[in-house]
Amino acid sequence: MAAALSQGGTAITMKALLEAGVHFGHQTKRWNPKMKPFIFGARNGIYIIDLQKTVGLARNALRFVSDSVAKGGSVLFVGTKKQAQDAIREEASRSGQFFVTNRWLGGTLTNFKTVKQGIDRLKTIEKMAADGTYERLPKKEVAQLEREREKLEKNLGGIKELSRLPSALFVIDTKKEHIAVHEANRLGIPVVAVVDTNCDPEGIDYVIPGNDDAIRSIRLFTGKVAEACIEGKGRYSAWVAEHGGHDERREQEDRDAASERGHKDRRDRRDRRGGPRERREPREDRAAASANVEVVRKGEVAPAAAPEAAPAKE
């Protein structure tokens, strides 16, 4: 597996990183101390990223991406900043993956069922335009549908064919895309990201220290991740063909992931309540207590816990 990556289009070299300006971080006054382990030093008030670490970490990240896709998974590319949009859109499309480039809609992952309704609506309008329905509608209604379609396409076009949650996220600029990272963390979806010196690496499963502002740097890493997806997809296709087209591995992974998300959601709810729920009394004890209350209510006996009246003082 490692050999395939090192010899193919996913190869990461020091020369390529230097030429793309990957080593240039942010000004020293705009840094996140948690990025200190990935910083080589400072020059002219700008932090220089340790490219030796970038090379090793990028290779690990690409290996993970390739293996995830080889198991039948998918990768969601996320980059809404202007200089990242074109690269994210082009490379995700080239590798047959999914992307978000306009803005991250809150709940894209954590409330995927609702987002799926928007996707279904987009497909319905597209079908209406293709099957001639538009021709039977008033022009005003067609114009309204087109405006709705354009808005949905802008926000959901990149995930239109996403039928289930992705196996991984690839993110450019984790500071800007912190909501996407948070949602992935909540669901246990691994995050691969290019992390600059002003970002927080916590919550990122595969940190790639590097410049997340320069277009050449963004294109370099986005292209490498796309190549890893293509390589993994080839292995997946070969595996499915060999096993008669039935993907038991992916089905089992879906079940395991759903189970893990369920456990995590229950733990989160318990933590928000302030700890585990108090143990309830056994059913027999609750029934007995209920009977005692009913007896007291009818006046048959006095409450056992009722204190005696205090004697009057002289």
Swiss-Prot record:
GO terms for MF: structural constituent of ribosome
SUPFAM superfamilies assigned: Ribosomal protein S2
Biased composition, class Basic and acidic residues, residue ranges: 244-265, 271-287
Composition bias, Low complexity: 302-314
Ribosomal protein is among the record's keywords: yes
GO CC terms, sorted: cytosolic small ribosomal subunit
Disulfide bonds: none
Any one Gene Ontology BP term: translation
InterPro entries documented for this protein: Ribosomal_uS2 (IPR001865), Ribosomal_uS2_bac/mit/plastid (IPR005706), Ribosomal_uS2_CS (IPR018130), Ribosomal_uS2_flav_dom_sf (IPR023591)
Keywords, in A-Z order: Ribonucleoprotein, Ribosomal protein
Region annotation Disordered: where it falls in the sequence: 244-314
NCBIfam families on file: rpsB_bact
Family indicated by similarity: Belongs to the universal ribosomal protein uS2 family.
Annotated protein name in UniProt: Small ribosomal subunit protein uS2
Native species: Anaeromyxobacter dehalogenans (strain 2CP-C)
